[in-house]
Amino acid sequence: MENEEIPEFLSPKEEIVYWRELAKRLKQSYQEARDELIEFQEGSRELEAELETQLIQAEQRNRDLLGDNQRLKCEVDSLKEKLEHQYAQSYKQVSLLEDELVRARSIKDQLHKYVRELEQANDDLERAKRATIVSLEDFEQRLNQAIERNAFLESELDEKESLLVSVQRLKDEARDLRQELAVRERQTDGIRKSAPSSPTLDCEKTDSSVQASLSLPATPVGKISENSFTSPKGIPNGFGTTPLTPSARISALNIVGDLLRKVGALESKLAACRNFAKDQASRKSYTPANLNSSSSSVLNSSGVKYSHAGHTSFFDKGAVNGYDPPGVLGSRPPSPPGLLPLSV
């Protein structure tokens, strides 16, 4: 009410009315506050008496509680002593159990490690067993293939012996023909001296072709050996010599050319047989590891047939590519007595 603002009055009557109403309100609030004060004093006296009785009762209960508290403290002390004794015993038991647990765990770890080692060793043994079985089966298969190839090689070696005899026979025939040609040339020397010194152009060409054919080597691979057919000394054209007739020269050229082709084919076939024999012997000397590394090439070669046509087959690739295994077949078999060695 103190904070109420006094309004502005237009007339004194309004101001008088305002202050009268305000006095009535203040008087009424004063009466109400006085009644409340009287009522509060009466209630406070009653409350004070009640609180005094409650205080007396609380003091009595406090004395009882203090006695109970003292008794409970004694019981707590006795229980604490018992608890400490029990705790010490339980601590000793727990320590013993922990030590036993540590020992049991260490034994368990050792057993687990031992079991793992046994399992690993068992797995290694099983893998080694499987690998041994596979390698044994592979070795048996390759052994069977080697036996078959050896049988085939033996047949080829027999055929090679027959080819050597044929080649030697053809060489003897070629040597006889060469000697015959030399005799004929010597016989015609006297005729050539008396004949005109200007032969025809055709005779010169035929003579040069005969000399070129006679000077060809016996091997088709281009190697000149001690057993190759060498032509006699070149006959000079003209200068008082008379050449053979064209028909005789052509026939001799054809005969010698056929013989050279046959000998070349036989020597090529013989070279293929020798290379095949060397390759087979080198394959026998390989270890099982080398057999495993070359399994694909050997298996692929099982379907390739050996050719008798004078060219190298699959089994000759080692020698053709420059690979000649050392120690294979020891040394070449000696030629039969009375036969000339064949150069390859």
Swiss-Prot record:
Highest taxon of the lineage: Eukaryota
GO biological process, one term: mitotic centrosome separation
Coiled coil: 13-190
Biased composition, class Pro residues, residue ranges: 333-344
Keywords, comma-separated and alphabetical: Coiled coil, Cytoplasm, Cytoskeleton, Microtubule, Phosphoprotein, Transport
Subcellular location: Cytoplasm, Cytoskeleton; Cytoplasm, Cytoskeleton, Microtubule organizing center, Centrosome; Cytoplasm, Cytoskeleton, Spindle
Pfam families: NUDE_C
Signal peptide annotation: none
UniProt region (Disordered), positions on chain: 186-209, 325-344
One Gene Ontology cellular component: kinesin complex
Gene3D superfamilies in alphabetical order: 6.10.250.1080
Molecular function per GO: microtubule binding
InterPro entries: NUDE, NUDE_dom
Entry comment on modification after translation: Phosphorylated in mitosis.
Protein family per UniProt: Belongs to the nudE family.
Protein role: Required for organization of the cellular microtubule array and microtubule anchoring at the centrosome. Positively regulates the activity of the minus-end directed microtubule motor protein dynein. May enhance dynein-mediated microtubule sliding by targeting dynein to the microtubule plus end. Positively regulates lysosome peripheral distribution and ruffled border formation in osteoclasts.
Name of the featured protein: Nuclear distribution protein nudE-like 1-B
Organism this protein belongs to: Xenopus laevis
